[in-house]
Amino acid sequence: MRKKLTALVLSALPLAAVADVSLYGEIKAGVEGRNYQLQLTEAQAANGGASGQVKVTKVTKAKSRIRTKISDFGSFIGFKGSEDLGDGLKAVWQLEQDVSVAGGGATQWGNRESFIGLAGEFGTLRAGRVANQFDDASQAIDPWDSNNDVASQLGIFKRHDDMPVSVRYDSPEFSGFSGSVQFVPIQNSKSAYTPAYYTKDTNNNLTLVPAVVGKPGSDVYYAGLNYKNGGFAGNYAFKYARHANVGRNAFELFLIGSGSDQAKGTDPLKNHQVHRLTGGYEEGGLNLALAAQLDLSENGDKTKNSTTEIAATASYRFGNAVPRISYAHGFDFIERGKKGENTSYDQIIAGVDYDFSKRTSAIVSGAWLKRNTGIGNYTQINAASVGLRHKF
């Protein structure tokens, strides 16, 4: 009897040691369909008889077939915990991992927000892969679940959301206000990258120029200020990098769905800074969120680039159903000091979540995104999805 009791106590010790560890995550997947439309307008020269050359406009339109597939909508699993170190000090840690019920996907542990740190009356200090201040505020403005982060989520607006390998400090709350600062060392910032391309000689022979991976850009700095009072919440997020690897080319690549760090680093810039202001209001079943974003940078020749965008999301709960709509608009961008004519974008996402329980919901959405790429030119994406989400 004594041996059995001893064995029982010993077997319970590991469980007691990890009693403060929480397992959590989301499993979500469904069916998605999308198609692309584009229009290209070209000015061509044609013979005009005695009058000489006459300019002729050629308009080309194209449309893809509807592509439908079963996709994972961003499933993940996480572990987090803490340990009381005494005198109000705690050790905190978290490990998150992307998973996919559709097969494939990321295989490295800790590819989502994962860190270790200390928390106390002074605030919280964390090191690891930590979400930045832009990512903090995005849930309010973009609560959509989808595999298509460009059209079925506000992917262009959220292109600065990141979980960089960094150190971050969050202050305690004072009268509704709190702040944070974050630092990404140069060796942890994304590398500069020039994609492969073809050149043509005088005989029209094509030569492939291979891709070139350069050195890291520079240290990256983030800061944030939050305010919460009753149903109102506000957030300001800031980013600065002296040498950045995100520019207009990255903007284009993100539009067509490229998600790699290398693809995001095609246009090295200087003095890159981003400002985003987000405000939200929640009362009963009503949720409203508004956001504005300004992206500024310089080129090697001292000319300047900028993009200005706005986004809004509204939802209201009717029993188990939560209909929702989002809208985003990007104004004509400025490149090398000159305004790009007809370079804006517009995006609308509408859908509904239906809660079967507190943890399981059906999710339905439809999306439309139109990106103007010059006078008479545009790319349009139409998408729809139906899926199921379970939280644990």
UniProtKB/Swiss-Prot annotation:
Membrane topology category: Multi-pass membrane protein
Matching Gene3D superfamilies: Porin
Record's signal peptide: 1-19
Residue ranges of the TM segments: none
Protein keywords: Cell outer membrane, Ion transport, Membrane, Porin, Signal, Transmembrane, Transmembrane beta strand, Transport
Main location: membrane
InterPro entries: Gram-neg_bact_OMP (IPR050298), Gram_neg_porin_domain (IPR033900), Porin_dom_sf (IPR023614), Porin_Gram-ve (IPR001702), Porin_Gram-ve_CS (IPR013793), Porin_Neis (IPR002299)
Cellular location(s): Cell outer membrane
Gene Ontology biological process: monoatomic ion transmembrane transport
GO MF terms held by the record: porin activity
Domain of life assignment: Bacteria
One cellular component term from this protein's GO annotations in UniProt: pore complex
Role summary: Serves as a slightly cation selective porin. Major antigen on the gonococcal cell surface and it may have pathogenic properties in addition to its porin activity.
Summary of subunit composition and partner proteins: Homotrimer.
Family named by the database record: Belongs to the Gram-negative porin family.
Protein name: Major outer membrane protein P.IA
Originating species: Neisseria meningitidis serogroup B / serotype 15 (strain H44/76)
Organism taxonomic ancestry: Bacteria, Pseudomonadati, Pseudomonadota, Betaproteobacteria, Neisseriales
Gene: porA
